[in-house]
């Protein structure tokens, strides 16, 4: 058989690919898989096919991108942007996740985080799990296993990924008791359900990813608290306090974030009588993915002692990142957090950055333009935040996404938009280089 008819050596080809810088992040096993697939499907073009497959494999790895969509809490991009915890970035040492340095004895992983959350929200106690849905499962299992959970039909929400509140209630070992109708639920509906069923708790779910308007009626936390049963509030969105005292500057001046003032907060629901409130850490809090369970000491203690607490608890990296987030709040310096920095950027600043980029490109197809950002992350539907960005005539979303540092842009109205509200100013040069190279070859 002529030598040219033999398939190339998988090992040799994998070694050649490993020498290419663009594949530095790929482990050898993935390079070998790419080469084997290429040899099996296109032996005569094995090397070029293997390169293509290796590039696809590289793209499947988690990597940092530039969010130019204008969605502050983009679920597909990890929701609230955040740097690595200082403790992780600065050293490779052990951490006092469950050690009390004062006594040398075993401590609680919630220590300082719990103290900070109590100060910031008015809660009596708190525990942290790995996300909001986990928090709801834990609370329901601890307080209502085998018994009824009463909830308005207008609050039987579905969150991302097809997960539904009724299914979560069922998996918690509880019995769902629906009351009212989709658009109108009254106190009497809850009362009748409690009188005729074995009800353990009342569940109030904030419909954060949709709105029901028009001929509507709902029962607030304060009224539900008169029913004589524990009230669980699934707030989800994670706003600690609608007055945002931690955003004020040294003179007490608040930034223009009027769009958030009508959003219910943890402090509000607790003060109105909720026994426990559950929120996400990576939404309007601006921290890592986590679920915060805040409320009365006895209830939180019951949750902390439940067998599900162990498998659902947050890990060390999450607790460190959450602690740093809350310390910024405690210092009234929440604007230093990436999410709040983006949310509070002024139109003047954004317009100036857009103008500088457009002037540097100097092409008729590219101009600075007004646009609208959105909170995202299943929060505040229909809320628009005035913004500014770069508008490129034509469709270049795919090209920008394929840049060395992927830029996630938005296609709309025959143009490609890069909303600068969600782009770090330090990345403006990357955006400039990408637009020049991909579109105009400058």
Model-found features: residue ranges?
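Short Gly/Ser/Thr- and Asp/Glu-enriched loop/turn motifs at secondary-structure junctions
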Residues: 8, 66-70, 285-288, 385, ...
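Conserved PLP-dependent catalytic core of the aminotransferase class-I/II
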Residues: 151, 318-319, 323-376
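Glycine-rich phosphate-binding segment of PLP-dependent enzymes
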Residues: 35-36, 40, 68-69, 79-103
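Conserved C-terminal alpha-helix-loop-beta "cap" of PLP-dependent enzymes
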Residues: 351-430
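Conserved PLP-enzyme active-site core in the AAT-like
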Residues: 104-316, 320-327, 434
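Long amphipathic N-terminal alpha/beta scaffold segment
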Residues: 44-82, 87-89, 115
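A short linear hydrophobic-aromatic micro-motif
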Residues: 61-62, 279, 405-410
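Long amphipathic alpha-helical segments
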Residues: 1-61, 65
